[in-house]
Amino acid sequence: MTDTHYDVVIVGAGHGGAQTAIALRQNGFAGTIAIIGAEPDLPYERPPLSKEYLAAEKGFERILIRPASFWNDRHIAMHLGCAVERVDPTQRLVFLADGRSMGYGDLVWCAGGSARRLDCTGHDLGGVHYVRTRADTDALAAELPGVSKVVIIGGGYIGLEAAAVMAKFGKNVTLIEALDRVLARVAGEPLSRFFEEKHRSRGVDVRLRTKVGCLLGQDGRVTHVELNDADPIPADLVIVGIGIIPAISPLVVAGAKASNGLLVDASGRTSIPHVYALGDCAAHVNSFAPNDIPIRLESVQNANDQAVVVARTICGTAAQYHAVPWFWSSQYDIRLQTVGLTAGYDQTFVRGDPATGSFTVVYGRDGRVIALDCVNATKDYVQGKRLVEAKALIEPGMTDPQYPLKNFMTPSPA
């Protein structure tokens, strides 16, 4: 027997889930809406978890996407602190971990993902932390007053942002990256080397081409990180940032097609009728990526923009997702803004001088602009976004920061 029924059930109370509900109401949807969230909290912003929230610069109320009154006023039911264990697409039912079932007219799956865990010996010792949820960050922050030596595993954005906060707190920080540079999977060498130098200048010991063998501990708590080819590193606390695992199992079991994420079309539809997916757990063909291979993007922009498309589709309006991807990161006094996708780039060049702390890395593929990484260069970001959207031809003058990027936009035919 079904405990309750909603016209739209949204699984996931992150950016994508919140924006789907908001966009449904903005598009005139008058039916019943429920958001199911595995965490006990109202939808909140995720990026601050490894930055302002971890640094205690913002309290939790300041990172809420909307206050409780917003959801109540719009008659959006919140079912928090409960996970979906199973989906029956034939009966259009979701089954919750607490034993309840819920019927749906349309199901929107935006459950995100879980932090990828270490699988080495000692992974379960006390003092080993991940930064994926508010509870993760709260647990990490609670231990900081009693520690001095922090080891961060992973040189992606989460690891770098956490390193910046730890350095600000005066901790002795070591950052371990298995590849030959930080941000190797998402950025070119000029940006990687800039961030490596910046972190080292703030006292962070950045170790590249370094792999973790195991974690050592005493009395159930981590004391050292043992490396495959070097002496163990003393550690009072370990922060792990090595990616996420998409939360898609219930839908895959129900028959949804997946490849590193639930496969969706340009309107967010999965292979199961009346089931949509978006955000971190959805894989789509993106016009700014090469070879029409489905990709999965982990960003607020992607989740929010896909949510708007799905909401419009549910409301009966033809909508497709074609937004240019963008992303940002803050570390120390650095504001990085990226636009486009670097996948398959075959050339890069730098506008400006990294030594000044303000520059832009431009990425090209087949002679056209495909992405930019802008460091403290907002004007380049704003103007460069138009170049990426237009897939503009690369021109020699683009390397000179004296020439605004808007000068290289080819005028539209009259």
UniProtKB/Swiss-Prot annotation:
Its cofactor is FAD. It catalyses: 2 reduced [2Fe-2S]-[ferredoxin] + NAD(+) + H(+) = 2 oxidized [2Fe-2S]-[ferredoxin] + NADH; 2 reduced [2Fe-2S]-[ferredoxin] + NADP(+) + H(+) = 2 oxidized [2Fe-2S]-[ferredoxin] + NADPH. It comes from Sphingomonas sp. The keyword NAD applies. Part of the multicomponent carbazole 1,9a-dioxygenase (CARDO), that converts carbazole (CAR) into 2-aminobiphenyl-2,3-diol. The lineage of its organism: Bacteria, Pseudomonadati, Pseudomonadota, Alphaproteobacteria, Sphingomonadales. This is Ferredoxin--NAD(P)(+) reductase fdr. Its EC number is 1.18.1.2, 1.18.1.3. Pfam families: Pyr_redox_2, Reductase_C. Monomer. Carbazole 1,9a-dioxygenase complex consists of a terminal oxygenase component CarAa, a ferredoxin reductase component fdr and a ferredoxin component CarAc. GO terms for cellular component: cytoplasm.
